[in-house]
A protein has these predicted regions:
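Expand to "…catalyze enediolate/carbanion chemistry for C-C bond making/breaking, isomerization
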Residues: 1-246
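A short, hydrophobic C-terminal helix/tail in secreted or cell-surface proteins
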Residues: 247-251
Length: 251
């Protein structure tokens, strides 16, 4: 599923916050077509004045965004409170949470399990690196990334990696995306349309991968044992289970 995120947080100057909020919420005055694109609004932190104003405006509207992205979440309480407020307003808005603070990283597991509204966790390397006093490179942030992946997986959530910031280095972005995919990320954020084709290619299973996954699952079902040999390779049951997420509809 592709996502489009409307920005209200760091990308908007304080003097422009109110106008940006008004224009962002106006985008949802009329229903959107079912085009397979999830529309999200990234609000300001609920620990800040602008975040409280964002939430207040969303609770007051009859046509809220389908989903909200919560930045700089430090504890599950923030998610629980917003969930309760949305329920009281009668909104079925979904939630996406960014883990980008040291406190949030420590509470990642609890945050992942804090609301049935949650669909995904995002890893925010840009803010996380200075929090951890490390470089914003793959190796220094590997532990933090892994912890977010583990938390999201435990709750059955998608997990999205930070966007690649060098728009001209598409080869570098491909490498970073492949590293994220191998670590367990479901996708990677994008800050420019020209990044999207490569990201879709990296994170979308190929026809061969899907066919192999289906064949492996079928072989296990037929054999009804703990392991099978396919093309000379010994494959155990846990490997078959890991293939289930690749068996997507081909439509």
């Amino acid at each position: 599923v592709d996502m489009v995120c409307v920005e209200l947080e760091d990308g908007i100057a304080p003097k422009d916050k109110a106008e940006a909020r008004k224009k962002a919420l106006a985008l949802f005055d009329n229903p959107h077509s079912d085009d397979g694109v999830e529309r999200i609004v990234r609000i300001n932190s609920m620990r800040e004045k602008f975040g409280i104003e964002d939430v207040s405006a969303i609770l007051s509207t009859q046509t809220p965004p389908p989903a909200l992205m919560m930045p700089k979440v430090r504890s599950p309480d923030e998610v629980i409170i917003l969930d309760q407020l949305l329920s009281e307003a009668g909104h079925d808005t979904r939630l996406h949470v960014i883990i980008e603070t040291n406190e949030g990283l420590e509470a990642a597991y609890e945050i992942a399990h804090s609301s049935d509204r949650m669909d995904a966790m995002f890893f925010g390397a840009i803010d996380m690196a200075p929090e951890l006093r490390c470089d914003m490179a793959w190796e220094p942030l590997l532990y933090a990334r892994s912890k977010v992946v583990h938390a999201a997986a435990s709750a059955g959530l998608d997990v999205i990696d930070v966007p690649y910031l060098d728009l001209e280095d598409l080869d570098g972005m491909r490498v970073a995306a492949e590293q994220a995919r191998m670590l367990g990320f479901s996708g990677k954020g994008s800050i420019h349309p020209k990044q999207i084709p490569i990201l879709n290619e990296v994170f979308t299973p190929s026809a061969d991968q899907i066919a192999r996954a289906r064949r492996t699952i079928a072989e296990f079902e037929k054999a009804n044992t703990g392991l099978v040999v396919i093309d000379g390779k010994l494959i155990e049951k846990p490997v078959s289970v890991s293939y289930t997420h690749l068996t997507l509809p081909t439509t």
